[in-house]
Swiss-Prot record:
<dbReference type="InterPro" id="IPR013020">
    <property type="entry name" value="Rad3/Chl1-like"/>
</dbReference>
<feature type="domain" description="Helicase ATP-binding">
    <location>
        <begin position="7"/>
        <end position="285"/>
    </location>
</feature>
<keyword id="KW-0004">4Fe-4S</keyword>
<dbReference type="InterPro" id="IPR010643">
    <property type="entry name" value="HBB"/>
</dbReference>
<dbReference type="GO" id="GO:0006289">
    <property type="term" value="P:nucleotide-excision repair"/>
</dbReference>
<dbReference type="GO" id="GO:0000019">
    <property type="term" value="P:regulation of mitotic recombination"/>
</dbReference>
<feature type="binding site">
    <location>
        <position position="133"/>
    </location>
    <ligand>
        <name>[4Fe-4S] cluster</name>
    </ligand>
</feature>
<dbReference type="Pfam" id="PF13307">
    <property type="entry name" value="Helicase_C_2"/>
</dbReference>
<feature type="region of interest" description="Disordered">
    <location>
        <begin position="750"/>
        <end position="778"/>
    </location>
</feature>
<dbReference type="GO" id="GO:0000439">
    <property type="term" value="C:transcription factor TFIIH core complex"/>
</dbReference>
<keyword id="KW-0805">Transcription regulation</keyword>
<keyword id="KW-0539">Nucleus</keyword>
<dbReference type="GO" id="GO:0016887">
    <property type="term" value="F:ATP hydrolysis activity"/>
</dbReference>
<dbReference type="GO" id="GO:0003684">
    <property type="term" value="F:damaged DNA binding"/>
</dbReference>
<dbReference type="GO" id="GO:0005634">
    <property type="term" value="C:nucleus"/>
</dbReference>
<keyword id="KW-0547">Nucleotide-binding</keyword>
<feature type="binding site">
    <location>
        <position position="115"/>
    </location>
    <ligand>
        <name>[4Fe-4S] cluster</name>
    </ligand>
</feature>
């Protein structure tokens, strides 16, 4: 379908379009025209990705600036999905225009997913793959071979073959999904990872994970060549604040400190060896540092530093590395002193939390280590590892963490906290101390993105309440909007169950969650829904701990035996492989008619990235409100920080956080307008939180369904499922929830008549101002 938004011709790869897709595109165009940031909440399963791509690529191709698009998503499967959508869109554009546009679209993921080297790709741990790859591809190994052809150095042929080709000729033009990229590179014996890395500046659109833009350790290497007028899109961005915080946080355990000591000793031995054989090497390095050169000046283009800079670009120091860590021996003994100090700090019996400033003061009093040399730790370690030509870099990963920790704690003060806990997990009998350097302010990591790029679009299916994000991430928006879902026939039934059939109020509140009457009520609710739900049913709990305790109580009450009669029961566990197996079995049981129930956790893998479309999810049951564990020291510190700096009250944030996760769980069952499902929120506290649900869920929640008992909810569900079982005529949806080209033109004309819009010749103008939608123009 081809239509115009103002003067912009948009090619949409489907013959029909949803009204909300059209409104969404109009708002994205407004954001791009005005420049600035917007937050848009689009209902689940209404083709958000394809709308985003259709509009932004039309915008890119139509206007002469050809602004690059950076599309960030969370998981590997979402990135792959976006690439496939992009491929379809570009095929459609080629067909409609009659020629192939000069266009490149690529996706980037970790080495582990893209490596083709027969030995390295066998490794299961991502960090090991990274280190082995670096060892075979860094410029040092290549130089060594050139100097001494007999040297025992292994190079990666996939990477070496890239030197024979010009960067723009690595790949033909077009869009490459991961599958297509790997296949092409396998045939040509080329390295897919480095192809994408080096072609980023040549791409029209690059699709990758948030970390490549938000985590300074990676962003500096990957995204520094991206132009400032790029359009940045954060898709599935309901958790973006957590990603920002993780990118500047670090945990150290006693085991890591032990390994770091071993690493420092190994470095010492290596320095002694080099002193005997080639002492000039160390002298050269020392002289370079005296001249005030940095790793950026010393490393060649093809080399990556051993320790990536963990701080944001604007916080880097440009002065020379301090004198007391220039000599290799001095630096290693400096690291050893630091590690020994950290070991003594770990010997605690109760939780300690302190600011970076007080930690550095105490460190200076005891070990005479100044703040300045600490800031250069990661850079100095990179240079030393390079000078010593260390090949077994895996031995030094713990040392890398120590250097990163030193650089972070000496660079940042405001919005950071150091917490030392004697027990890594609650109720542990054996002390296993852990030192957490944690970022409390989500805006620090994302600030460079807002400062650097003119348009940033943050979007998701569950991002309500919208005004929380600009406050948490400290930025201004030009547009905030939540879209309702247009339906010819109600295809999802949200309900809030506040009491069991015996009228006892149900809740997962900590004080009463193990009360037998509440557990029994939750159990009988599960049995009743299992009886009437066709095929698949997904149940979410607030935490693994609560799920384990309630399931074992159900077992003793005989509730699970009752459920078995109707459906299989499968459980999500913290182990990724077990969960994958459970999901596979669940899908099999749903497809062959046995039906199944999947018990999972609100912040787990299942709730975040797995879709239960059609028969795989007909009912989703949310047992209890998924609040965070409020006794966590880090959470307490973060809440206090937000209250003092951003005036966000503790309860507001906790409630917002719980509701975005609950909405995320509910959205799993509705993956399109032809899909249907029942959404049950089972906790009496939900009835007060209706306003915090996304607009499209709240619109389907009638006043009568806010305070139901189990038996009333069951009778509503029976009626709803009977209605949905009737064959539907697709014609009923036309013009209401699905628009043909004619409907779209009709809508544009009616808007034009209302808004007195000046018509371009032969072009359909559009001005979309829905009074009823919560829109903010600043």
């Amino acid at each position: 379908m081809k239509f115009y938004i103002d003067d912009l011709p948009v090619l949409f790869p489907y013959p029909k379009i949803y009204p909300e897709q059209y409104n969404y595109m109009c708002d994205i165009k407004k954001t791009l025209d005005v420049g600035g940031n917007s937050i848009l909440e689009m209902p689940s399963g209404t083709g958000k990705t394809v709308s985003l791509l259709s509009l932004t690529i039309a915008y890119q191709m139509h206007y002469p600036e050809h602004r690059k698009i950076i599309y960030c998503s969370r998981t590997m499967s979402e990135i792959e999905k976006a690439l496939v959508e992009l491929e379809n869109l570009m095929d459609y554009r080629t067909k409609e225009l009659g020629y192939q546009e000069d266009f490149r679209g690529l996706g980037l993921t970790s080495r582990k997913n893209l490596c083709l080297h027969p030995e390295v790709s066998k490794e299961r741990k991502g960090t090991v793959v990274d280190e082995k790859c670096r060892r075979m591809t860094n410029g040092q190994a290549k130089r060594k071979l050139e100097e001494d052809p007999e040297a025992n150095v292994e190079l990666c042929e996939y990477h070496e073959n890239l030197y024979n080709i010009e960067v723009e000729d690595y790949l033909p033009k077009g869009v490459f999904s991961f599958e297509k990229l790997l296949k092409y590179c396998e045939e040509k014996t080329l390295c897919p990872y480095f192809i994408v890395r080096r072609m980023i500046s040549l791409c029209n659109i690059i699709i990758y994970s948030y970390h490549y833009l938000l985590d300074p350790k990676i962003a500096e290497r990957v995204s520094n060549e991206v132009s400032k007028d790029s359009i940045v899109i954060f898709d599935e961005a309901h958790n973006i604040d957590n990603v920002c915080i993780e990118s500047l946080s670090l945990d150290l355990t006693t085991d890591a400190l032990r390994r770091a000591t071993r690493g420092a000793n190994a470095l010492d031995e290596r320095i002694s060896e080099v002193r005997k054989v080639d002492s000039q090497k160390l002298q050269d390095e020392y002289e370079k540092l005296v001249q005030g050169l940095h790793s950026a000046d010393i490393l060649t283009d093809q080399e990556e530093p051993f320790v990536e800079t963990p701080v944001l670009p604007q916080d880097l120091l440009t002065e020379a590395i301090p004198g007391n860590i220039r000599r290799a021996e001095h630096f290693v003994s400096f690291l050893k002193r630091l590690i020994e100090y950290l070991k003594t700090r770990m010997k605690v019996l109760h939780v300690i939390s302190e600011t970076p400033k007080s930690f550095l003061q105490h460190l200076k009093q005891l070990t005479f280590i100044e703040r300045k040399p600490l800031r250069f730790c990661s850079e100095r370690l990179s240079l030393l590892v390079r000078t010593l030509e260390v090949t077994e870099v895996e031995d030094f990963t713990a040392l890398k963490d120590i250097a990163t920790f030193a650089t972070l704690i000496s660079t940042y003060e405001e919005g950071f906290l150091l917490i030392i806990e004697p027990y890594e997990i609650e109720n542990a009998a054996v002390p296993n101390p852990i030192m957490r350097f944690t970022c409390l302010d989500a805006s620090i990591a994302i600030k460079p993105v807002f400062e650097r790029f003119s348009s940033v679009i943050i979007t998701s299916g569950t991002i309500s309440p919208l005004d929380m994000y600009p406050r948490m991430l400290n930025f201004k928006t030009v547009l905030q909007k939540s879209y309702a879902m247009t339906l010819a026939k109600k295809s999802f039934l949200p309900m809030i169950i506040t009491k069991g059939s015996d009228q006892v109020a149900i809740s997962s509140r900590f004080e009463i969650r193990n009360d037998p009457s509440i557990v029994r009520n939750y159990g009988s609710m599960l049995v009743e829904f299992a009886k009437i739900t066709p095929d698949g049913m997904v149940v979410f709990f607030p935490s693994y701990l609560y799920m384990e305790s309630i399931v074992s109580m159900w077992q003793t009450m005989g509730i699970l035996d009752e459920v078995w009669k109707h459906k299989l029961i499968l459980v999500e566990t913290p182990d990724a492989q077990e969960t994958s197996l459970a999901l596979e079995t669940y899908r099999k049981a749903c497809s062959n008619g046995r039906g199944a129930i999947l018990l999972s956790v609100a912040r787990g893998k299942v709730s975040e990235g797995i879709d239960f479309d059609h028969q795989y999810g007909r009912t989703v049951l949310m047992i209890g409100i998924p609040f965070q564990y409020t006794e966590s020291r880090i959470l307490k510190a973060r809440l206090e920080f937000m209250r003092e700096n951003y005036r966000i009250r503790e309860n507001d944030f906790l409630s917002f956080d719980a509701m975005r996760h609950a909405a995320q769980c509910l959205g799993r069952v509705l993956r399109g307008k032809d899909d249907y499902g029942v959404m049950v929120l089972a906790d009496r506290r939900f009835s007060r939180k209706r306003s915090q649900l996304p607009k499209w869920i709240a619109q389907g929640l009638s006043d009568a369904d806010l305070n139901l008992s189990t038996d009333m909810a069951i009778s509503n569900t029976k009626q709803f499922l009977r209605t949905m079982a009737q064959p539907t005529d697709p014609k009923d949806q036309e013009g209401v929830s699905v628009w043909s080209y004619e409907d779209l033109i009709k809508h544009q004309n009616s808007r034009k008549d209302q808004g007195g819009f000046i018509e371009n010749e032969n072009k359909e103008g559009e001005q979309d101002e829905d009074e009823d939608e919560d829109i903010e123009m600043q």
